[in-house]
Design a protein with these regions (language model features):
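Residue(s) in the substrate-gating loop at a strand-loop-helix junction
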Residues: 143
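A conserved structural motif in NAD(P)-dependent oxidoreductases
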Residues: 213-224
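Catalytic Tyr-X3-Lys loop
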Residues: 100-119, 139, 165, 215
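Conserved glycine-rich cofactor-binding loop
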Residues: 14-16
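Conserved mid-core segment of classical short-chain dehydrogenase/reductases
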Residues: 70, 93-108, 154-157, 197-201
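Alpha-helical segment proximal to the catalytic Tyr-Lys
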Residues: 127, 174-178, 237
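Short C-terminal tail/terminal secondary-structure segment
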Residues: 93, 229, 240-255
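Active-site helix of classical SDR
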Residues: 122, 161, 169
């Protein structure tokens, strides 16, 4: 049990990677607060976690609303007394369109959720970690698209927000190292989650995606969750500022 008695917040926790991280954290002894925009989805997801009633709670929180973020973090502190781990998994993506065709609303949605939303929740949690003086652990969930543009898929702004998260990770790691607060980032590759799920229903599309992976298969949410457990644990106590690609070798390949 690697996360015994730890209190963890996981954003974007109602499905896929966020939910799988929440499950793995509970298995390892943590109590987990699942955050997302819709409480009905969160409660439904929460009930798939063993011992969910005693090991988890769900709270609706819109990360684009600063007042709501602050209020949510305060409520968590009032109930649990500490926050040991924050997993910034929440994010959004637009339909693939050329950059010059994007409207301001598209730009604002991407940047406000993927960047400023992450900034808001991290800032609020950091304040509590610093007040408690017991250190802490922040894990950002990014994407290998932070490091390479995606051919034939027009996601320039999305890729840019993920690249910014990489630098945010490194900056936090250095700035708060002396406060015993670690920060790392996991960059998943092609994982059976989100928009990718719909493509995998078609055998031809699945084969194309699998053939592009050096390890000839699609990643699963649990692959990312296992990495998150490791980074959250004391086994990784001397790891901070690291960008961990969980992508079956994709980022090391040419294709």
């Amino acid at each position: 049990v690697r996360l015994k008695d730890k209190i963890a917040i996981v954003t974007g926790a109602s499905s896929d990677i966020g939910l799988e991280i929440s499950k793995k954290f509970v298995e390892e002894g943590a109590k987990v607060i699942l955050l997302g925009r819709r409480i009905d989805k969160l409660e439904q997801a929460r009930k798939t976690i063993p011992e969910y009633s005693s090991k988890t709670s769900a709270m609706a929180c819109d990360l684009t609303n600063e007042a709501q973020v602050i209020q949510t973090v305060n409520q968590i502190m009032d109930h649990y007394g500490k926050i040991d781990i924050l997993v910034n998994n929440a994010g959004t993506i637009t339909d693939p369109i050329h950059f010059h065709e994007m409207q301001d609303k598209d730009l604002n949605s991407l940047v406000d959720t993927n960047l400023f939303g992450t900034f808001r929740i991290t800032k609020s949690v950091l304040i509590k970690m610093l007040e408690n003086k017991n250190g802490g652990n922040i894990i950002n969930i990014g994407s290998i698209s932070a490091e390479r543009a995606i051919p034939k898929v027009h996601l320039t702004v999305y890729c840019t927000t993920k690249a910014a998260i990489n630098m945010f990770t490194k900056g936090l790691a250095v700035e708060y190292a002396r406060k015993n607060i670690r920060c790392n980032c996991i960059n998943p590759g092609i994982v059976n989650a989100g928009m990718i799920k719909s493509y995998l229903d078609y055998p031809e599309a699945r084969k194309v995606l699998e053939d592009r992976q050096p390890i000839n298969k699609i990643g699963q949410p649990e692959d990312v969750a296992n990495a998150a457990v490791y980074l959250a644990s004391d086994e990784a106590k001397w790891i901070s500022g690291t960008i961990l690609n969980v992508d079956g070798g994709k980022s090391a390949s040419e294709g």
